[in-house]
Regions:
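N-terminal ligand-binding lobe of clamshell/alpha-beta domains
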Residues: 1-173
């Protein structure tokens, strides 16, 4: 809205903000109708491990998940392997700061080379996902609406068509 005001297109800016808010509300409403809220951990860095903070915990909650690590409105924090193992997420979303999916896949050895990796419920159930953190999760802005859509697709694939799959997220496999 501030940019629109500076460019003297305030009404267009207000309309765009309204459209983005409506998209977010629609996603949240659909996700909240889900019977289950899977336990989700989002990692913003792989070595050392860092739990995603800032806006990501709120996005997880709005997408119908129960955020396990990181606090909404707080900076991303380093975590221990023990805390990741104790939280034992049903879904693990990798969104390293500044990395695209190709680079994230290359860096996964920081996780997969550890013996404990295979003990995680998300790993055992094939619910580990790579995202393009650089484009969708690591910066605030209007694109966070798409970030919410991506998390909806990952957390509740039965409720959301995979329109961002392969382009913005993929199964770690």
């Amino acid at each position: 809205a501030c940019v629109a005001e500076a460019l003297q297109v305030e009404s267009k800016g207000r309309e765009l903000v309204k459209q983005l808010e409506q998209r977010m509300e629609g996603i949240t409403d659909r996700a909240c109708a889900a019977r289950e809220r899977p336990r989700v951990a989002c990692l913003e860095w792989l070595e050392p491990l860092m739990a995603a903070g800032n806006w990501v915990p709120e996005l997880v909650q709005r997408a119908g998940g129960a955020n396990l690590l990181g606090e909404a409105g707080e900076h991303s924090e380093p975590i221990t392997w023990e805390s990741l193992l104790e939280s034992d997420p049903e879904i693990l979303v990798l969104m390293p700061c500044g990395l695209d999916m190709k680079r994230t896949r290359e860096e996964m050895y920081w996780l997969t080379d550890r013996a404990q990796w295979k003990t995680l419920k998300a790993v055992q159930n094939g619910r580990v996902y790579l995202t393009d953190g650089n484009h969708y999760f690591n910066r605030p802005g209007p694109r966070l609406v798409e970030s919410l859509e991506i998390l909806g697709e990952i957390i509740h694939p039965d409720l959301f068509a995979p329109s961002f799959k392969e382009r913005a997220w993929q199964e770690a496999g």
